[in-house]
């Protein structure tokens, strides 16, 4: 693998030496303050979320729920926004510029949360009204020779500008791009399409201001090993009406193509070069892509490369737990890889475009994405600064051209739950808006279908006689939660193809097994990972109904999901602590039963057990004594879940053994633990890069003399970091905790805590020292390379 990466590095280094395009990383050494005078400014690096650092704001005694928008789930003023105060952050950076002749310069922002304004040398030069999409500003004639002062103002807007915690600031990459001034590729210029799993067509948007009578574009396709597998050159004559045009290369055939799929997500690289008259490279742009075929239909749901695939996934907001909105690639990949371990193959980007790195990591790891642009189509829910109708076209253009070449993107979603909003620009449940937006999308990509996630699926809350008008317009019928209408709607409208775009974790199991899995596309579990914002009420800082806590620790119910998302034999044992009656939210019942894996209980007490399994039957043993064997229920409401009530507690070990065809294939046990005797540290990143952005997640556990996690230990830990790295977040998974995430201490919760370190720019020996009042100091030796 190292040889392959080096080969790619040398190929593209050589090509870039020939070309004039360059990208300068501007992520480092910004000054940040909460006012434009930069009072008490501090040095930060991008990505950065200024809101995550702020204190929690508890609701005052007189704050009441706001039910004017049932979907907003507003329990108090800041409950939807994660109990963080709204505000503005100011960023300042000095850019030293040495002008080069015939060169064009662009500032490239991948996003500013939630809205942003950009100033160069005191002059307002641009910004964004919807910070989830990127933008660029041509600064060719604005940059001075020598020092230039770049200032960015980022605003969270008011608390009603979003239904969830957004974070605030420069939460994605910033760069300075330079290209030739007279002939160059435009922003996100390449459009790469494939046919019949072997043919590739490449077109590109470019500008030519030279006197050349023809423009030549050379297209080269490389496989993942760096071998050239196809090449062609396209020609286009001058266009007197427009200097910015599109050039399309002839279709290329790839011999013995390797397909992109979920298990082997093979990626090719397309390198496009605009050539000068002497054959040298004027500008160059490269992008990864995959060769694959996607199909949708009412009789089979979804096919990838001709084979039926069920989407098994989740839908969450863009934030990353204790890191807030800051889009760290390592944190994103950690999530993706964990979800794959639990049988997932799909993520819906609710309800906005995630970072470009997220999409690229889904390409790399074999995840299918429903790529979503908006929540509701109103000013309030799309930045709140300007009318929605003023910016949707530019948002769509940026979003689609950025992601259209990624094989992981299988479906476009233009919005979410919009038809219930009374403030729509047109009073027809979104149909007019959709009909205006869809042609803009298809102008830039016609290879994928388009949907909108609908809830309720009907015209209003009072009737469910027919699907809403918008469901008659979309290519795919995406219903949030209302999977029970798939059969009836399918009979009345046999052309419909169904996707459960949000599924409740409270109804987990039945909302999978009760669907006709032969015909549906699949589902995405809403809030499968706990997140900040959309709190059901203080002290919870956010959504707590996930099957993974906010630090990514799996809850027992995560294994229930895995039992039907994966074929791997599984049995998982937990204790039902109490049953959550659930609460109504957004027209559905939500909530999760409180379960634990604690087997330290009062003598003489009784325990009710839940066993999740995909085995035929399960045997239960207490200290080696067989308590019985039970079959896996076959009905949809109880399948893969066995309850065992009234077990007399005895200290020791209780174990569940799963059987298939009479053979033991899986087992899981809970044990009575002893007193915690030490803290152990486990780092997750063996290839920690000194790139200024890579992360190291270190999980700390309190263990007994046998190395078992002591779930009842709640000691406070204090952390010190030495070397070229710094602590950027701490967490323990407790959504109710009042502790801050950006600090150097954390109390254990369920015997665990996690520290997240950010690498510096120089390779370094790193030491994390963990102290507490109870345990010996733990020294963790790490290294960045």
Spell out what each predicted region is:
Residues 20-108, 162-170, 573-582, 593, ...:
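Extended carbohydrate-recognition surfaces in non-catalytic/accessory domains of CAZymes
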Residues 1-21:
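Bacterial Sec-dependent N-terminal signal peptides
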Residues 24-39, 86, 159-160, 183, ...:
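Substrate-binding clefts and catalytic carboxylate motifs of secreted carbohydrate-active enzymes
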Residues 54-96, 101-109, 113-120, 126-129, ...:
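Active-site-adjacent substrate/metal-binding segments within catalytic domains
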Residues 24, 28, 33-35, 81, ...:
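Accessory beta-strand-rich segments of carbohydrate-active enzymes
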Residues 213-218, 261-268, 606-608, 613-616, ...:
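Short flexible loop/turn segments that cap and initiate beta-strands
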Residues 145, 205-297, 644, 650-651, ...:
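Extended acidic/polar, glycine-enriched regions
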Residues 139, 247-260, 642-649, 741-761:
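Short, hydrophobic beta-strand segments
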């Amino acid at each position: 693998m190292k040889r392959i990466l080096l080969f790619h590095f040398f190929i593209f280094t050589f090509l870039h030496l020939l070309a004039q395009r360059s990208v300068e990383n501007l992520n480092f050494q910004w000054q940040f303050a909460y006012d434009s005078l930069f009072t008490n400014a501090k040095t930060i690096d991008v990505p950065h979320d200024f809101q995550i650092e702020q204190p929690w704001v508890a609701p005052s005694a007189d704050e009441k729920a706001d039910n004017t928008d049932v979907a907003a789930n507003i329990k108090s003023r800041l409950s939807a926004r994660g109990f963080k105060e709204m505000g503005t952050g100011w960023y300042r950076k000095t850019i030293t510029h040495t002008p080069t002749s015939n060169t064009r310069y662009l500032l490239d922002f991948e996003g500013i949360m939630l809205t942003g304004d950009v100033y160069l040398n005191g002059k307002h030069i641009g910004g964004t009204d919807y910070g989830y999409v990127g933008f660029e500003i041509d600064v060719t004639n604005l940059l001075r020779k020598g020092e230039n002062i770049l200032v960015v103002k980022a605003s969270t807007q008011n608390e009603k500008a979003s239904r969830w915690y957004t974070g605030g600031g420069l939460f994605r990459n910033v760069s300075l791009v330079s290209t030739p001034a007279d002939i160059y590729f435009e922003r996100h210029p390449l459009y790469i399409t494939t046919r019949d799993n072997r043919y590739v067509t490449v077109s590109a948007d470019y500008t030519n201001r030279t006197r050349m009578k023809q423009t030549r574009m050379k297209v080269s396709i490389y496989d993942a090993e760096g071998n050239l597998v196809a090449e062609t050159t396209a020609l286009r004559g001058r266009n007197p009406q427009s200097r910015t045009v599109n050039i399309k290369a002839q279709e290329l055939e790839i011999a013995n193509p390797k397909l992109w799929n979920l298990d082997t997500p093979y990626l090719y690289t397309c390198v496009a070069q605009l050539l000068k008259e002497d054959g040298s490279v004027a500008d160059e742009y490269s992008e990864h892509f995959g060769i694959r075929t996607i199909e949708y239909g009412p009789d089979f749901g979804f096919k990838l490369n001709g084979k039926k695939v069920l989407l098994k996934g989740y839908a969450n907001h863009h934030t990353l737990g204790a890191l807030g909105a800051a889009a760290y690639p390592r944190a994103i990949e950690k999530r993706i890889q964990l979800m794959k371990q639990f049988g997932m193959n799909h993520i819906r980007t609710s309800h906005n475009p995630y970072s470009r790195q997220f999409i690229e990591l889904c390409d790399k790891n074999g995840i299918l994405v429903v790529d979503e642009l908006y929540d509701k189509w109103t000013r309030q829910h799309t930045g709140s600064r300007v009318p929605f109708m003023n910016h949707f076209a530019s948002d769509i253009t940026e979003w689609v051209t950025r992601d259209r070449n990624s094989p992981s993107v299988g479906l476009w979603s233009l919005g979410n739950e919009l038809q219930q909003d009374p403030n729509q620009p047109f009073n027809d449940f979104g149909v007019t808006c959709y009909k205006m937006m869809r042609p803009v999308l298809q102008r830039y990509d016609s290879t994928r279908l388009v949907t909108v996630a609908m809830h309720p699926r009907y015209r209003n809350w009072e009737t469910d006689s027919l699907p809403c008008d918008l469901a008659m317009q979309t290519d795919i019928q995406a219903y949030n939660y209302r999977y029970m209408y798939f059969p009836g709607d399918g009979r009345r409208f046999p052309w419909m193809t169904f996707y459960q775009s949000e599924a409740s974790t409270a109804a987990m199991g039945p909302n999978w097994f009760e669907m006709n899995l032969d015909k549906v596309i699949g589902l995405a579990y809403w809030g499968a990972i706990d997140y900040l914002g959309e709190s059901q009420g203080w002290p919870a800082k956010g959504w707590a109904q996930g099957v993974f806590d906010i630090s990514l620790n799996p809850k027992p119910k995560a294994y229930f999901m895995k039992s039907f998302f994966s074929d791997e034999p599984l049995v998982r044992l937990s204790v039902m602590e109490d049953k959550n009656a659930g609460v109504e939210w957004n027209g559905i019942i939500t909530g999760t039963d409180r379960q634990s894996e604690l087997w330290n209980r009062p003598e003489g007490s009784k325990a009710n057990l839940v066993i999740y399994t995909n085995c035929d039957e399960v045997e239960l043993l207490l200290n080696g004594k067989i308590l019985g064997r039970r079959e896996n229920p076959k009905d949809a409401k109880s399948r893969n879940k066995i309850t065992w009530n009234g077990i007399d507690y005895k200290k020791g070990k209780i174990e569940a053994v799963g059987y298939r065809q009479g053979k033991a294939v899986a087992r899981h046990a809970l044990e009575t633990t002893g007193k915690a005797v030490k803290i152990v540290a486990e780092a997750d990143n063996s290839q920690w890069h000194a790139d200024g952005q890579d992360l190291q997640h270190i999980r700390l556990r309190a263990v007994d003399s046998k190395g078992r996690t002591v779930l009842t230990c709640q000691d406070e830990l204090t952390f010190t970091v030495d070397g070229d790295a710094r602590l950027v977040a701490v967490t323990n998974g407790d959504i109710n905790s009042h502790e801050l995430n950006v600090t150097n201490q954390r109390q254990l919760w369920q015997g665990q805590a996690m520290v997240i370190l950010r690498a510096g720019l120089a390779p370094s020996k790193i030491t994390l020292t963990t102290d507490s009042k109870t345990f010996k100091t733990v020294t963790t030796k790490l290294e960045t390379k």
